[in-house]
Regions:
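Active-site loop immediately N-terminal to the catalytic Tyr-X3-Lys motif
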Residues: 143-147
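Conserved glycine-rich cofactor-binding loop
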Residues: 16-17
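Conserved NAD(P)H cofactor-binding loop of Rossmann-fold oxidoreductase domains
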Residues: 83-88
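Substrate-binding pocket helix/loop in short-chain dehydrogenase/reductase
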Residues: 91-92, 96-104
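SDR active-site lid
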Residues: 169-234
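Residue(s) in the substrate-gating loop at a strand-loop-helix junction
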Residues: 136
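Active-site helix of classical SDR
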Residues: 115, 152
Length: 273
């Protein structure tokens, strides 16, 4: 039996822009009641709909996440969409521990906190509740200069795998969504820190862009069809399969085919290695 999204009450993080905004646009068509959480006050203010409640919260700060939990205490949501993401690109030697922790707070710990709260405030126990977690291709294969992001997403992926089985006892479906490289500001405007930014070196993600609106519609269809995994077939998936079977080949492909090759050559020229 298909899942009926009509009139569902939903909380989504990172909903003011990008994939989150595209998902909200699709969910509004189904008369969903939405709580949109985002750290960008300007973009939040641009969202105006009677079915959307807006909450300003920076999930990089766990104190703010705690305040968020107090604001939604007692609410009975049908669906939680853990969509917010944050990335810092840098050589490990240049990234601060605080920035590394910020990555983990936004991409992992805040979502764990929301998931834990969601379990205790179920609107029902008859299979009508779902948690949708946005992981990443990089959760399956990390990329140089993106260690904080990739490792936090890998943690989130493993957490989701665990929850998918564990939450069955509460009749909660836990869905793993693996977005491709989307045509959003998250990817288009992302920059390196430190030396790599100063030298304006190409970002270490050479995958082609994919339509955000199209993927949002695919997610909605996947939810309605009770899918456990939602992803798009691409050459990246072929690479991940090869990497799974032969990790050493994955290493070679990353070194030779990604923008890391350009970065590595520049580091050598400037005597950084």
């Amino acid at each position: 039996m298909n899942y009926n999204l009509q009139n569902k009450k939903i909380l989504i993080t990172g909903g003011a822009d990008g994939l989150g905004k595209s998902l909200i646009d699709e969910l509004i068509k189904k008369n969903c009641i939405i709580t949109c959480v985002d750290k960008d006050e300007i973009k939040l203010n641009n969202i105006n709909h009677e079915n959307i409640k807006k909450i300003l919260c920076d999930l990089r700060n766990l104190n703010e996440t705690e305040l968020l939990l107090k604001k939604i205490e007692g609410e009975k949501y049908d669906i939680l969409i853990n969509n917010a993401g944050y990335e810092i690109g840098s050589l490990l030697g240049e990234v601060s521990i605080k920035d590394f922790i910020d990555n983990y707070n936004c991409n992992f710990f805040s979502h764990v906190m929301l998931t834990k709260a969601f379990i205790s405030t179920l609107s029902s126990r008859n299979g009508n509740t779902k948690i949708i977690n946005m992981v990443s291709d990089t959760a399956f294969r990390a990329i140089p200069t993106r260690s904080s992001y990739c490792s936090s997403k890998a943690s989130f992926r493993n957490f989701t795998e665990s929850m998918r089985v564990e939450l069955k006892i509460y009749n909660i479906d836990c869905i793993t969504v693996t977005p491709p490289k989307l045509d959003t500001d998250f990817f288009k405007k992302i920059q390196y820190f430190g030396y790599l930014n100063k030298e304006k070196l190409p970002y270490a993600d050479s995958r082609p862009f994919y339509s955000t609106n199209k993927f949002a519609r695919q997610i909605i269809t996947g939810i309605e069809n009770n899918k456990k995994y939602i992803w798009v077939f691409s050459i990246t998936k072929i690479f991940l399969f090869i990497n799974y079977l032969f990790p050493f080949i994955g290493d070679l492909m990353v070194e030779k085919l990604s923008t890391w090759k350009t970065i590595k050559e520049k580091l050598k020229i400037d005597n950084k290695v």
